[in-house]
């Protein structure tokens, strides 16, 4: 048994080399600009969701695994860095339970095979203290070297805690100002074609049509800034995990074609808050959906996703999903459809 195990471990580098490339691959590669065509964007989990029982059957996988592209994904959101209380960003093996990050060479290999790779900042459990400009500056100073070393093509803002509006659309709250400080601070130090996407929950966007303040609509002035200045690639609003408001105070259940189209049309036509209108045209929308039942509330079957997509006759930029790993655990029925 010992000899068999030893032989197996000796074969692992050969197998890995055959499947995913070699350790001699280049460790630096150019920043890729915004994809010209349609995108299928998925979150790549840097932890093992199979080992912890969340989605058995497909856990952690190399970011350069060709099965990702084979099932349609051409934009990858690497989720998530650990952010310490002082704002220090970490991106390394073991920074959290079962976490393993891709090496710079593996990132280049995935990019050479067609992927555009963004770092997703935030998530439900990886927030940042937006009340402090000192914390914001510490985050900028520690995340930028990581973005450069690991050959990221952009950042995805997935902040889900700590962002609140001031109550006046024309006046930024401290947290809004500090999130803009972070985004501007990162973009200023990266190449001009470095990307920016955002993945807010609906409450932070269309929820502002009901009342503007606290979390409700708190992304709106930030979205407007980066739509207007041309730096936002697209918006990945999350069409899941709760009912969704339209532009007129109307409400729709997640997981329905009606809710999908109401949200999408609302963004395209514009949300007017206190006399200020925020628009996100169809070609800057990449709506977010759960890849599988269990990945998030409001799951839509492939047939329903197809109906929603076809309704726009190709006008949307693409679709986003949580997550690549969830999709792989259920035979890729999101990506393949």
Curated annotation (Swiss-Prot):
Task: Report whether Glycoprotein shows up as a keyword of the record.
Answer: yes
Q: What is its main location?
A: secreted
Per the UniProt entry, the signal peptide is 1-25
| Active-site positions on this chain | 160 (proton donor)
List its uses: The antagonistic activity of Trichoderma harzianum is used for the control of several soil borne plant pathogenic fungi.
Q: Please give the subunit comment from the record.
A: Monomer.
Q: What is this protein called?
A: Endochitinase 37
Q: Which organism is it from?
A: Trichoderma harzianum
